[in-house]
């Protein structure tokens, strides 16, 4: 599945890349509202995906512009968000847009194993 072959349903409140991540989570056996939630409000902003199964995981989609134009300040903000969530026992995995659209099932599988491939 690629971004160009993905049809985002009307009413989806998020990016196409986030919808691809959502679909990959479902294909990985995760059930919405039971295992994970999309776009909940968390302290300090919004994290795209939080989980009840496993409860110590969160994922954030980094959109294309963000991925290509991030500098040290943006990475510092990401590291701060990761540290804040880590203080609550939650691992935040960043999902880079380009990697997500190339192979969403692989990237989500890696994220579910707590493997963060951002900034590689």
Across the structure, where does each feature detected by a protein language model lie?
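Nucleic-acid endo/exonuclease domains
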Residues: 1-120
